[in-house]
Amino acid sequence: MDNTIIRRAREGRIDDEMRKIAEAEGVSPEKLRDRIAKGQVVYIRNVKWPSEKVVAIGKGLSTKINVNLGTSTEVVDLDSELKKVEVANKWGDTLMDLSVGGDLDAIRRAVISKSKLPVGTVPVYQAFIEAFNKRSGGAYFTIDDLFNTIERQLKDGVAFMTIHAAVTKEAAIRVLKSDRVIPVVSRGGDMIIGWMLHNDAENPYLTHWDYLLELFAQYDAVISIGDALRPGAVADAHDEFHVGELVEAARLAKRAIKAGVQVMIEGPGHVPLNDVIWTIKLEKRLTGGVPYYVLGPLPTDVAAPYDHIASAVGAALAAAAGADLLCYITPAEHLSLPTVEQVEQGAIAYRIAAHIGDVVKLGRKARRWDDEVSYYRGRLMWDEMIKRLVDPERAYKVYTQYGPPKVKGCTMCGGYCPMNMVIQQARRLK
């Protein structure tokens, strides 16, 4: 464990990795080092398979977005998933392979090979599915099966993993007896809960946490503590199960940081808009600033097939309040496996949400982008403005969708463009 990035930071060392991150993020190497040492910043990578893109997540850094992809039991199309990787490479900062159908090892290795980004997984999926195929029951996987799967995926180059360690057997039993609208919506969490109930045993991640830390330290990979009991309906947000699991996750995160292992915490989920800021502040208070990786949040249950729009509202507010990594949501959420196009729609929505949040969280540093666009828009310098937009290619297509404008303005106002008239009046004043 002595050579993990946290250990090096605690020794006061600033190495080439830290300098590279600091330069990319526009922060001082000393501040970055101190935040890594405290567990407030994580560097997403596997030392055995460094990704092309440098990705650091946490305090004082730009908000990052994660793109989920992967096969289902109903749709196994590797070519399509690899096209989604290309979308992630263009728009995202990290990606997760959530495949549950087909040859999981082959799919994961193909995704890692194609990706320019750090790749994450949920290892219990593979342990559960392989046990189901071999023993006719997913909950029949052994603890050795689970940890062998984790080690195999780390050896393949997986940089971070969702580990549902914070749900206890007692909490699992109580949530299933509760009056929650939807007791459990986490697929990986459900698999761990099923294992605990089938085996009448405590969460294997929880009972073997120290061994798990040793595994991750070998690769300096990041543990992302999953939220098995995250609210799947706005009515369930911040109930005893949601908050109780977050408290346990905070305890586990502190143990990981003490051991020199990088860690994030995952968050909701479905949360009313008026509670989004509060849930971010709560995580930061409980953990001392451990990076928060949130799904959405989605502030309404009624928006499908427009959940990418609805959740981007929650995501922007979450980022402004201090969320560090946003897990995107696509138009297919709650309805279907997403297509390549839907993956891109979700990724773009979240790229915009992340920037909106950063304008608040990082201030002038993030707002320079907006200021440049507005400068050129106000002077009708269309080429300069368009190439600075979030999606210049689509922007140009929209700008010319009725043919090249016949006047200096666009086809919306035409000759009555207010900026054009202001420019002419300003010239007269001079």
UniProtKB/Swiss-Prot annotation:
Cell membrane found in the keyword field: no
One Pfam family of this chain: ThiC_Rad_SAM
Keyword Transmembrane: no
Ligand binding (Zn(2+)): H270, H334
Reactions listed under catalytic activity: 5-amino-1-(5-phospho-beta-D-ribosyl)imidazole + S-adenosyl-L-methionine = 4-amino-2-methyl-5-(phosphooxymethyl)pyrimidine + CO + 5'-deoxyadenosine + formate + L-methionine + 3 H(+)
Enzyme class per UniProt: lyase
EC number: 4.1.99.17
Swiss-Prot/TrEMBL cofactor(s): [4Fe-4S] cluster
Disulfide bonding pattern of the chain: none
Cofactor note: Binds 1 [4Fe-4S] cluster per subunit. The cluster is coordinated with 3 cysteines and an exchangeable S-adenosyl-L-methionine.
Protein's GO biological process: thiamine biosynthetic process; thiamine diphosphate biosynthetic process
Binding site for [4Fe-4S] cluster: C410, C413, C417
Ligand binding (substrate): N68, M96, Y125, H164, S186, R187, G188, D227, A228, L229, R230, E266, Y293
A molecular function (GO) term: metal ion binding
Pathway the protein acts in: Cofactor biosynthesis; thiamine diphosphate biosynthesis
Keywords from the UniProt entry: 4Fe-4S, Iron, Iron-sulfur, Lyase, Metal-binding, S-adenosyl-L-methionine, Thiamine biosynthesis, Zinc
Family statement: Belongs to the ThiC family.
Function of the molecule: Catalyzes the synthesis of the hydroxymethylpyrimidine phosphate (HMP-P) moiety of thiamine from aminoimidazole ribotide (AIR) in a radical S-adenosyl-L-methionine (SAM)-dependent reaction.
Protein name stated in the entry: Phosphomethylpyrimidine synthase
Source organism of this protein record: Pyrobaculum aerophilum (strain ATCC 51768 / DSM 7523 / JCM 9630 / CIP 104966 / NBRC 100827 / IM2)
Gene encoding the protein: thiC
